[in-house]
Design a protein with these regions (language model features):
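Generic hydrophobic secondary-structure signal
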Residues: 44, 69, 74, 97, ...
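Acidic, proline/glycine-rich low-complexity IDRs
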Residues: 92, 99-170
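Pocket-edge structural micro-motifs
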Residues: 48, 76, 140
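N-terminal leader/targeting segments
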Residues: 1-68, 72-73
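Short glycine-rich, basic-tinged beta-strand/loop micro-motifs
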Residues: 61-91
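Generic alpha-helix signal with a bias toward terminal, lower-confidence helices
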Residues: 20-24, 48, 79-86, 126, ...
Length: 170
């Protein structure tokens, strides 16, 4: 079930959130098209993000290892940062990408515990704001895994949403 902090809830409630059908830039589309691989250890990794030389992630560290590798930057450059609807559209794109990747993992061993954390930088006064994209990280709740998403309101400079398989439309 989707959980979101106040900043993300604000973006989701905006009329601009549903302005258009979300799109995915070409580079991220290749990540969607390539899909997932299941490592011998059971780790769920994005094919395009899997290191060429990689040691197995131990069972006791599966979620944390997945989190480090399944780190996707989704460009927002084409959305027009000066536009009033930029942030809601950025959230829409990030959530759309996360749902598509979760859907493509459905049925893989361990996917029932797979989560997607979507982050959109909302501090418009930050000098690096124009460089920010959407960050989506995928990890399972197996072994040690990031627990800092348990309390989303601690994130004040980012709109954060955490999705699981129940958020994927069939």
């Amino acid at each position: 079930m989707l959980r979101a902090n106040a900043a993300m809830r604000s973006l989701l409630g905006s009329a601009a959130f549903a302005v258009d059908q979300p799109t995915v830039p070409e580079m991220e589309q290749t990540t969607l098209d390539a899909g997932w691989t299941v490592e011998p250890s059971g780790a769920l990794l994005l094919v395009r993000h899997r290191p060429k030389c990689m040691h197995d992630i131990p069972a006791e560290a599966l979620g944390g290892g997945e989190y480090e590798i399944n780190d996707v930057y989704v460009s927002l450059d084409d959305l027009g940062r000066e536009s009033v609807d930029f942030l809601p559209r950025a959230a829409s794109r990030g959530l759309y990408f996360a749902r598509r990747m979760l859907a493509s993992a459905r049925g893989l061993p361990g996917s029932e515990t797979l989560l997607a954390a979507v982050a959109i930088h909302v501090d418009v006064d930050d000098e690096d704001f124009a460089l920010q994209g959407a960050t989506i990280r995928f990890f399972s709740r197996r072994g040690s895994y990031p627990d800092w998403f348990d309390e989303l309101e601690t994130f004040t400079l980012e709109a954060i949403a955490v999705l699981d398989m129940s958020d994927v439309r069939t």
